[in-house]
């Protein structure tokens, strides 16, 4: 079965092919004989109820600096010309991102969009996890500064995060007596009107933040992301270091708790973040870590994903 695949992502010529999960997905698709097109989210349009993308056919190669060969730009009808869309642009989860999910919702599931765009919109990673009581550390989501002060008084050391964002940007640890809380809250208020997250600090983060990848609710494998010395952010984009790790009984328990909801929502490719015994995020936008997982364990999450996509398309989905 040869599929027509459009990949909505950040500029392809600027990616790091050693770490980029979207690139691994594209390489796997190409190896199976699927035809690839690339476009950035700003090239997506809607006119009279139909959705189009100004896209370029692309071939990908494991060759740094020459990893993508782009063809002439064409206008794709996303319902008639494409079988699968990989929605892989990185956050911020802003109104442009949300609008793109509305566009792609109009063609899904006739054109299979991975992940289901309506559910990507409905499941921001730091909010979606709150649907599963008892899996998180104590967590407050608010724009009420007094509530945040009260939360810190009850829990001591906390971590402050923007509600919408990614890659560890804007994350800060505050000690129980840290005088900088006011300044940080003022900074968040200046940047935007969104609520922030205050979360009880989990000391186990010094040993790493585990990223578990799931395909259609089933765990494929995990990597451990260890923060740089003196840091609490373990994200690879801000200096975290990846290392091999085994899935624990608790990891599998957490996966089992969320799996039915992932399947129901059509969230085929998901990355969850686990610190110690706690689930802290469910990433459904553009999960990373597949390259490192393959390097450490030989497990290719992109292969597992494409097996599932092909099965869905073969059965009329």
UniProtKB/Swiss-Prot annotation:
User: Which cysteine pairs are joined by S-S bonds?
Assistant: none
Keyword field contains Transferase? no
Instruction: Summarize where Mg(2+) binds, as residue positions.
Output: 281, 283
Q: Name one GO molecular function term.
A: ATP binding
Indicate yes or no for the key word S-adenosyl-L-methionine. no
Q: What UniProt keywords apply to this chain's record, in alphabetical order? A: ATP-binding, Glutathione biosynthesis, Ligase, Magnesium, Manganese, Metal-binding, Nucleotide-binding
- Biochemical pathway: Sulfur metabolism; glutathione biosynthesis; glutathione from L-cysteine and L-glutamate: step 2/2
Which segments constitute the ATP-grasp domain?
Answer: 126-310
State the needed cofactors, names only: Mg(2+); Mn(2+)
Question: Could you tell me the superkingdom of the organism this chain comes from?
Answer: Bacteria
Q: What is any Pfam family matched here?
A: GSH-S_N
User: What family does this belong to?
Assistant: Belongs to the prokaryotic GSH synthase family.
In Swiss-Prot or TrEMBL terms, this protein is called Glutathione synthetase
Q: Which gene encodes it?
A: gshB
